[in-house]
Amino acid sequence: MRKIMNWVLAATFICGASVFTSCTNDTGDNPTPESAKNRKEFIKHTRENLKDLAENLNFGSWEAANKINQEFNTTVLNNPEFEKAIIPLFIQKIREGVKPVEEGSELAALGYKQYATIDLTKFNYRFTMKEDGSGFDVEEADDFEMIINGYNPKTQKQEKGVRKLTLQASGDTYKQLAKRLGNEELAVVILVPSDFAFSIASMVPGSMQEVFIGAFKNNVKLSGKSEYMNIKTDAIGITGVISSNFPKIKEGNHAADATALFFSIDNDPVANESGMKFTFSHNDKSMIELEAAAKYTKKDFDFSQFITSKSILDVLVALVSGGSLEGSITLNEDLTSTLSINDCGKMIQLQREMAHARRNYADQATIEGYTKQLNEIVSAKMSCKGVNQEIPMKLKTEKFGVDYWAMPAFNFADENGYVSFTELLDKESVEYAINIVDHAAEPMAGAIVTVRQLLQFVQTFLTQMRVSQAQAQAANK
C-alpha cells in the first residue's frame, strides 16, 4: 500500500496533476473551443514550473532538521530513562493538588472520588541528559527544556549537551481526562494549552544556534456532551509552521537555505469530515502546496492515529477508504491540479491491482480495463495563472518502456482529443520531472513525518500512558 501511494505521489509531480492520480471521466468534460488557444500556454507553464522546481528545490535544511528530530525521537519518545525522570514529577504534581470531587459533577457521575489538575502551561522543567546517557538531571526552569547529547559534525564525536529543545505553552486551555486504569477513584485532569512554540538549537563553536523553530495552535470545538476534550467526539483543528534557516556556508559553496512547512489539519468526527493542507516554502517562495478534504464513512475513525501511526499515508488511506476526497496540488503558486474521488476505497483497490498486473507485464487490454474503471470514479482538471480556462483530464492507457501504464491525459478541445502528458512534454521537461521526484519525494515525506512526531512529542510528553502510570502510583501511596 505504501509503495502504491508513493508511486501516486511521484505521478503527481511528473504530470503536475493530483495527489493520487490525474484522471477524469468523459461525462461533463465539455471542453470549449477557447481551450485550444490555451494549449501552448499550459504547456509553457508546465515546462517552466518543472524547470524552476528542479533547479531550485533545496531540502538540505529539511533533511538536517529531520535528522535532529529523529535524535529527539530516539532520545526522548523511545527512551525509558525519560519515563523514569518525568513520572515522579507527575506524581508530585498530582499529590500537591488532590481535591474531593464535588457532588453532582461529571466526575462524580463517572465514579471518581478525588481529582487533581495538571496545567501544562506551568509544567516547566529542564531535563539534562547525563554524560553517559544513563538518565536525566532535572531542575525547575522558565520553560520546558531538554538538553541532550548528540553527534557533533565539527568534532565527529558524540558529545554532551549539543542539542537543546525549548517548549513554551500558552493561551487558552482545554480540559482533558487522563486515561483511566481499572476503577481508580482519582481523576487526573490535564489542562492542554491552545498555543505551543518550540525551538531546537544545535551547538556551534561558542554558543547554541537555533536551527529548527516552529509553533502551532490547537482549536477545539467541544461537542457539548462533556466538559472534557475528547478527540473521538469533538472537532479539532491544528495549524502551525515549522521552519529551518541555514546561513550561507563558504566551505562547499552552500547557498543560504531557508525552508518552511506550513500545515493545517482538522477533523470533525460528528460530520465525518477531515482536511489537511501542507505548503512547502523555500527562501520565502511557495514551491508546492498539497490540500485534501475527505468525507469518510468510518464512524469509529480515531484522529489520534495521525500522531501515532508510522505513516501519514497510512492514516490518509485509513481515513478515506470507502469515502470521498477532494484534493489539489499547486506548483509555484501557478499551476494547479484538482481532483475528486467518489470512492477512495475502490480507487485504492484498483491502483493496487493495476500495479500488480503491470509488474507482471500485463497486456494493453488488461491495463485498459483498470483505466476505464478509474476514469469512472475519479475526475480531475488543471488550471494556471493568467489563463481563464480549466483543462479536463483523464487517464489514458499508453506504453511506457516495456509496460503499459494509465497515463494522465489532457483535452485542449482540438482534433487530438485527450493527449497523454508524455506526448505533450519534451524530453527535457520529463527529465526535470524525474529530478523533482528523485530530490523531493523522500524529504517531503520526512518533513510531514516530522510534523507528526513534533505534535506527538509536544502533545504527549504527558502521554496518557505516563499520566496513568503516575496516577496509579500516586493513588497507591
State what each model feature region is.
Residues 204-377:
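Acidic, serine/threonine- and glycine-rich low-complexity intrinsically disordered segments
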Residues 1-9:
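Bacterial N-terminal signal peptides that target proteins for export
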Residues 99-281:
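Long, acidic/polar, low-complexity amphipathic helices and coiled-coil-like
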Residues 9-17:
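Hydrophobic alpha-helical targeting segments used for export or membrane insertion
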Residues 39-43, 353-477:
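Extended terminal
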Residues 24-162, 427-477:
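Acidic/polar, low-complexity intrinsically disordered N-terminal segments immediately downstream
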Residues 135, 158-160, 286, 347, ...:
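Short, solvent-exposed loop/turn motifs
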Residues 18-22:
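C-terminal motif of bacterial Sec signal peptides marking the signal peptidase cleavage site
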